[in-house]
Amino acid sequence: MNPIGLGMRGLIRLYQLLLSPVLPASCRFTPSCSSYAMQAIEAHGPVGGTWLGLKRICRCHPWNDGGYDPVPPAHTERGGTMCPSRLPE
């Protein structure tokens, strides 16, 4: 992981350790929005992961039912997911 991604994950971890315990639990999703953002940054890099994390936070409100919402798989080729014909055997 590059230094920017590590720094961003470090900031999220600080939030989880310092702020999250004193705030009331309000995330409607599993995994929590902060865990989702960390996983997204790990899977998609700092830019793509941050974008996915922000979109997730915008969906986390009282009018959304929430539930299980995993990070989408990372693309293996620019602009698309791995084709079944290119899966390693």
Curated annotation (Swiss-Prot):
Residues 69-89 are annotated as: Disordered. The keyword Metal-binding does not apply. It comes from the Bacteria. It is found in: Cell inner membrane. It is a peripheral membrane protein. The keyword Nucleus does not apply. GO terms for cellular component: plasma membrane. Keywords: Cell inner membrane, Cell membrane, Membrane. Belongs to the UPF0161 family. PANTHER family: MEMBRANE PROTEIN INSERTION EFFICIENCY FACTOR-RELATED. Could be involved in insertion of integral membrane proteins into the membrane. This is Putative membrane protein insertion efficiency factor. The lineage of its organism: Bacteria, Pseudomonadati, Pseudomonadota, Alphaproteobacteria, Rhodospirillales.
